[in-house]
């Protein structure tokens, strides 16, 4: 009886472990990239306002603003990831030399429910390239902000992340509610 009990325990443990491994394997990271490019001249203005996401600003010698937004959902299925992506509206506008990028989560359940999605994780990463001489007005409700090698006025605000500035020349106004600021 003791041997039968051991075999039953080993079989049950193996079945339980297999179930856990298979369930864990069902989770995966899905990405959706959105890219937009605008022709500008140095000295223009970029405004980014987003409900969630990190914002990384790089500079170039060119006359373009290039926005690459990567939406990332860590969820059980591609179709569920697409439903999450569909609730994040990203809009772009250009008026002369000014560029505006707005990221907004649209859901009747509310912002904090959106962050969890029943255990699914969602994030956005903005990688934006601007001319070296450009002005920035950046705001994210949840994410880090990084800016490097820029000559212009900067306003950067995050409610839940760090702000990193490297070789930025011009007036600065930076604020974080839950992170560090490094100049």
Across the structure, where does each feature detected by a protein language model lie?
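Acidic (Asp/Glu) and glycine-rich low-complexity loops/linkers
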Residues: 2, 23-49, 54-140, 148-158, ...
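N-terminal secretory signal peptides that target proteins for export/translocation
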Residues: 1-8
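Bacterial N-terminal signal peptides
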Residues: 10-23
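General helical structural elements
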Residues: 8-10, 40
């Amino acid at each position: 009886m003791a041997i039968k009990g051991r075999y039953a325990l080993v079989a049950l443990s193996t079945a339980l472990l297999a179930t856990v491994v298979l369930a864990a394997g069902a989770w995966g990271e899905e990405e959706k990239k959105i890219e937009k490019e605008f022709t500008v001249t140095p000295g223009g203005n970029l405004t980014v306002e987003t409900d969630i996401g990190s914002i990384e600003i790089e500079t170039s010698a060119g006359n373009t603003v290039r926005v690459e937004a990567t939406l990332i959902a860590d969820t059980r299925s591609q179709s569920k990831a697409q439903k999450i992506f569909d609730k994040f509206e990203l809009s772009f506008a250009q008026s002369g030399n000014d560029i505006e990028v707005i990221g907004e989560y649209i859901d009747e359940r509310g912002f904090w429910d959106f962050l969890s999605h029943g255990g699914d994780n969602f994030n956005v990463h903005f990688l934006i390239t601007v001319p070296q001489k450009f002005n920035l007005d950046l705001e994210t409700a949840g994410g880090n902000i990084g800016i490097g090698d820029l000559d212009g006025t900067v306003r950067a605000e995050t409610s839940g992340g760090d702000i990193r500035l490297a070789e930025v020349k011009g007036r600065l106004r930076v604020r974080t509610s839950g992170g560090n600021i490094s100049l």
